[in-house]
Amino acid sequence: ATVLTALDAALGDFDQRSVFRYLRSALSGVDYDTCDRLENYAFLWDIRGNRWLSDWKNHPDGLGNDWTEEAKSRLELLDQERRRLMEPLEQLRQGFRDASSLNSQVEALYQFLERVGMEQRLEAMAQELDETGSNRESQILNQLWEILMSALEQMYDVLGQTHWEPEHFVR
């Protein structure tokens, strides 16, 4: 599901709903508090589209609030987190825009998965499940990366140079 939410966010031009669906997914690497702060700022300042890619400069508490050192620090941390999260999504979006074939789209998605450390996140989640006695769920997560890579390889090999509209890739 995380892969689909990332594709929705990137190919949907970063509308708030799809971005937060991705950020709230278990594999995005964003903790709940950070996600809440990003979401509050985005709603407060109506962040959508390319505004996700621009530096955030508005007060984290809204208009009329004093710029204290604490507020500046919070904004700086929010903006750093925004950059960390949005750079891979922007590269994914650009990879799909530049793609002339399904192969190029598969490569863009694979590069995104590598950038965000998806394989390592799946392994860490599987280890946590294993440690809590959820062996079956752990095994499923351990297999997920291989299944995803196999599916992408098959798409690459079979459909290769086929022209494919980005929005069809998600379906």
Predicted features and spans:
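Polyanion-engaging groove/track-forming segments
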Residues: 1-171
